[in-house]
């Protein structure tokens, strides 16, 4: 049953995941960040905060199809525009798999990410 307590727990769990992604991006020194609120999380290719659609660069838009396809290859469903939508049936294992897939993506494509963003600056 979706009680107010369960809603708060879900919000905190979702926010912790988003923060963990930003910690990953910072630790890997990659120009990416996750924003959103609660169960809606958007991945952006930028070091600057994204607060409106005009903040989304051409480089970010160019990299999103690669992120989408790479995460799908890892079994992670993400929207083609870089959005994650968390849901109540998901577990810590689901989020761990998503984070691991993002880590692989960074390891595989960090030089390309930087080059694409430079080319579109």
Please state what every model-predicted region is.
Residues 1-121:
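Conserved N-terminal phosphate-binding loop of PLP-dependent enzymes in the Aspartate aminotransferase
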């Amino acid at each position: 049953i979706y009680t107010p307590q369960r809603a708060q727990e879900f919000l905190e769990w979702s926010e912790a995941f988003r923060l963990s992604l930003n910690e990953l991006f910072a630790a890997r020194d990659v120009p990416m960040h996750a924003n959103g609120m609660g169960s809606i999380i958007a991945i952006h290719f930028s070091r600057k905060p994204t607060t409106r659609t005009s903040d989304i660069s051409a480089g970010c838009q160019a990299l999103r199809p690669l992120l989408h396809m790479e995460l799908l290859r890892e079994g992670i469903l993400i929207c083609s525009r870089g959005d994650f939508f968390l849901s109540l049936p998901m577990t810590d294992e689901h989020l761990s798999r998503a984070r691991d897939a993002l880590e692989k993506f960074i390891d595989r494509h960090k030089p390309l990410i930087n080059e694409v963003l430079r080319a579109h600056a």
